[in-house]
Amino acid sequence: MSKTAQKRLLKELQQLIKDSPPGIVAGPKSENNIFIWDCLIQGPPDTPYADGVFNAKLEFPKDYPLSPPKLTFTPSILHPNIYPNGEVCISILHSPGDDPNMYELAEERWSPVQSVEKILLSVMSMLSEPNIESGANIDACILWRDNRPEFERQVKLSILKSLGF
């Protein structure tokens, strides 16, 4: 277990506890493992996700912050940049050099100066503004592009279902 990663994660946790961005709650799943965090992300206003609060899991590699964490929504949500298994696909979570399709600028990808807060804010931004040019869920991309009302209806239904309705 990397002491550098542990120290960095504890520092980031303290910062989030002290000054968490609105609509975001995050922290370690247990006291015994600082490398797996649970997150709650409130859907941004004026989006199909506005009425939802979404569970996600952040998994940090042992060499964090040299390598990016993985963020997965549990359960998955319908979104062009979220794989059907719930894994989020955005630039900030991609290692430098991880761009086979040449869609991303190097400065958009992961670097050790990024933080948990920046990741979660980027995910909130992604919920507001999907990037269908670099989609992870092709069906969601097509629905977003070709039938926005149906896309929004399906998102709202999934929110109601997640709330037990």
Curated annotation (Swiss-Prot):
Subcellular location: Endoplasmic reticulum membrane
Alphabetical keyword list: ATP-binding, Cadmium, Cadmium resistance, Endoplasmic reticulum, Membrane, Nucleotide-binding, Thioester bond, Transferase, Ubl conjugation, Ubl conjugation pathway
SMART domains hit by this protein: UBCc
Domain UBC core intervals: 4-164
Phenotype when changing N81A: Impairs degradation of UBC7-substrates, but does not prevent protein degradation
A GO BP annotation: ubiquitin-dependent protein catabolic process
Residue location of crosslink Glycyl cysteine thioester (Cys-Gly) (interchain with G-Cter in ubiquitin): C89
EC number(s) per entry: 2.3.2.23
Oligomer and partners: Forms a heterodimer with CUE1. Interacts with SSM4/DOA10 and HDR1. Interacts with UFD4.
Name listed for the protein in its UniProt record: Ubiquitin-conjugating enzyme E2 7
Biological source species: Saccharomyces cerevisiae (strain ATCC 204508 / S288c) (Baker's yeast)
Gene it is expressed from: UBC7
